[in-house]
Amino acid sequence: MTDFRPADMAAGGKGAPLVPFLDYFLYRDPQFARIAQNIGGIANLTGIPPGASPLQLVAFDTGPGNMVIDAVMEELFQKRFDRDGEVAGSGRVLNAVVAKLLRARFFRQTPPRTAGREEFGREYVGRFLQTCHGASKPDVVATATALTARSIAAALHTFVLPRFAAKAAPARSEQKVCQLIVSGGGTKNATLMAMLRNEVAPLGIDLHFSDEFGLPAEAKEAVAFALLAHETWHRRPSNVPSATGAKRAAILGKISYA
């Protein structure tokens, strides 16, 4: 089975993201509001209000995941990534730089939205390094790491939690009923996880890892496309129009016989 995106695009969608169908399948709950946050090169989320239907999901790219951090590490240390977040953990965040970067148009754009190397690739990293000019190398890595954590928290605060508020039960409105379930390679960065936990705690959000729910952090995409293939085989739609912008549900993928 191949080509899962064209059917959604034919229905007016962007053909992405497709993983929200798995998030809904795994994490929907009648009582808890849950946010599935994947941190790969790009960070993306699926917001699932308590008792939600597929049409009530919100899903979009929050901004850079590991992409900027990895590029900065390669440029400054000739290393592919910041193992365990050790370099970031030894630096200090340039808060003024992060605040300036978060004022960019992308972070203010209302979902659905997608990001890639066009937004956060080499050109962006070059400008980022120039903005951090004069800072120590660990401080620059710490700042790149904070950008990922704070852009996720900002997206939650601005675009996700307001939707959850309307669904929250009055009796539990002051309790921590929102769970952030994190997956992807970013979960291996201890400093990033600590920063993210600190950023979302004031929002009333508890941080969890997908492993706690039976999904290994690095297996999410493989499981997602296995589920999409299963739905295609049974001729059931598996796009999420509220995430992709499609005008209708669609059966995704093509079946090819050898």
Can you say where each PLM-predicted feature lies in the sequence?
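Glycine-rich phosphate-binding loop plus the immediately following alpha-helix
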Residues: M1-Y24, I35, I39-R108
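A glycine-rich, Thr/Ser-enriched phosphate-binding loop motif common to dinucleotide/cofactor-binding enzymes
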Residues: G12-F21, V141-S151, E221
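Ala/Thr-enriched low-complexity intrinsically disordered regions
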Residues: A165-A171
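A contiguous, well-structured pocket-lining segment that forms one wall/lid of small-molecule binding clefts
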Residues: K79-F81, G85-F164, Q175-C178, A190-I205
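A short glycine/serine-rich beta->alpha loop
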Residues: P6-G13, L57-A59, A135-D139, F209-A217
